[in-house]
């Protein structure tokens, strides 16, 4: 599984080690691409005939010199697929509400991309999607009323703290949730 960065890597390793402590023996690996440059990794893995899955954020970004934000996460998915499957829309801001709306309006296509292309776009991003699954527990473990802001402030370090705090039951909850269906898919 290809992921954006160390936060995803830490969390997903913790979850998978609970579900299947020997997942690497079964040929399951998680690789951080340290950004969003998935396409080259996918090409190499395809050439080697290695199955891959991508987990990436539903980013809205403002192109240089423009006032509106575009669906950068959708562009990323289209690039990996090699065709324009998802619409590229403009938004006045990069709010979480806009990301959720964008996802909801295209959920059927995104589910098809999950099933047929192995690309799992977050509804929003790692931290918001995780908060949707475990909000109360995150508040308790991280001693904050805003776990998303806390996790995004110092991503790697704060995710390391969280990974130590979450329980096996939390891991099973994450594993079984739609937002993290990539984890179940990679274990098939």
Predicted regions mapped to residue ranges:
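Acidic, divalent-metal-binding catalytic cores of TOPRIM
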Residues: 1-188
């Amino acid at each position: 599984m290809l992921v954006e960065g160390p936060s995803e890597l830490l969390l997903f390793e913790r979850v998978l080690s609970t579900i299947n402590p020997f997942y690497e023996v079964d040929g399951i690996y998680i690789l951080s691409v340290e950004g969003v440059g998935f396409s080259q990794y996918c090409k190499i893995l395809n050439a080697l005939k290695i199955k891959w899955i991508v987990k990436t954020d539903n980013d809205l970004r403002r192109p240089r010199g423009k006032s509106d934000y575009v669906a950068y996460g959708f562009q990323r998915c289209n690039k990996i697929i090699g065709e324009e499957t998802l619409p590229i829309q403009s938004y006045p801001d990069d709010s979480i509400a806009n990301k959720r709306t964008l996802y909801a309006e295209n959920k059927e296509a995104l589910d098809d991309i999950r099933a047929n292309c192995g690309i799992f776009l977050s509804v929003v991003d790692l931290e918001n999607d995780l908060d949707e699954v475990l909000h109360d527990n995150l508040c308790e473990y991280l001693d904050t009323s805003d776990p998303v802001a806390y996790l995004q402030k110092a991503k790697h370090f704060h995710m390391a703290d969280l990974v130590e705090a979450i329980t096996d039951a939390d891991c099973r909850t994450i594993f079984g949730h739609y937002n993290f269906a990539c984890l179940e898919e990679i274990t098939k």
